[in-house]
Amino acid sequence: MAATASPQPLATEDADSENSSFYYYDYLDEVAFMLCRKDAVVSFGKVFLPVFYSLIFVLGLSGNLLLLMVLLRYVPRRRMVEIYLLNLAISNLLFLVTLPFWGISVAWHWVFGSFLCKMVSTLYTINFYSGIFFISCMSLDKYLEIVHAQPYHRLRTRAKSLLLATIVWAVSLAVSIPDMVFVQTHENPKGVWNCHADFGGHGTIWKLFLRFQQNLLGFLLPLLAMIFFYSRIGCVLVRLRPAGQGRALKIAAALVVAFFVLWFPYNLTLFLHTLLDLQVFGNCEVSQHLDYALQVTESIAFLHCCFSPILYAFSSHRFRQYLKAFLAAVLGWHLAPGTAQASLSSCSESSILTAQEEMTGMNDLGERQSENYPNKEDVGNKSA
């Protein structure tokens, strides 16, 4: 893809650079451009990217499908964090579905036609941003649940969480509008098709704008939000010293560190590519190195589909009990249908948290605080 969020096509050797990908380098001197060949970059990408995309697809699909099945089967009355986690799993799955298309496109060329070019690119961008936004929503939920459990508890209703989830999808859809409008197939050379955006005579401006948008909405603002929310949560945990405080602090730190490690290298590379296109610095050799870096760091960033759901889901004792119930049901069914139901019932009963249960993590502290302030919907249901 071009300057949208979609995976970047490999560099080519012609000088038609203004409307093409991040991998092109816009030289003022056309002679210098022609001397900057990127055959090695293209060869590397044709091997590395399809293999890495396939690995991410298999691992991410397995983990997110498991998460989705557990949430749908065992969490009929979902709290805010579980609604966000469910949407995160859906977002990741839709994101992962696009990777085989890009892998085939890199290894060969775009063979899926113009309609799928536009649709896959749009689907990619929507779920690229929605996945990051839902992670931020989960951080906000934990912040309200632990730091402001009493005064802001009315903000943490299922209706409001569904509303916020709808807003996230709407914003992500709006961000993908350039894909809907500009992305199309291009034949170059004859018989070889590529799928990327064509911005007409305003290619450079659009590329700079969309990269800035990606750095800001896709990394900087979510990172600052997570640092603020989890630092405040950490202060509360240190002050209250609940059981399991150490584990909860480690979970909070792990979530922030994981987001930074996965996304910072990619966003830094995008920023350096922007400076390169503006000719603030660089030459052909620098351009080649950044092309390699962009392929590698982009692939590392895509690992968030595999790691983020695991980190968030397994930070909750409640979810671990749900997972045990699910695995007991599946394994028990293959071993003995009669024992499967007993195992499922036993695990399901153990998944109910009580006031006497030990707090083992950050999510469990929030659950305990939530029990002290039942939300308005639950009170209405009980009174009815």
Curated annotation (Swiss-Prot):
GO terms for biological process: calcium-mediated signaling; cell chemotaxis; immune response; inflammatory response; intracellular signal transduction; positive regulation of cytosolic calcium ion concentration. It is found in: Early endosome; Recycling endosome; Cell membrane. Glycans are attached at N19. It comes from the Eukaryota. Induction: By interleukin-6 and interferon-gamma. Residues 363-384 are annotated as: Disordered. Residues 1-50, 114-118, 184-217, 272-293 are extracellular. This is Atypical chemokine receptor 2. It comes from Homo sapiens. The gene is ACKR2.
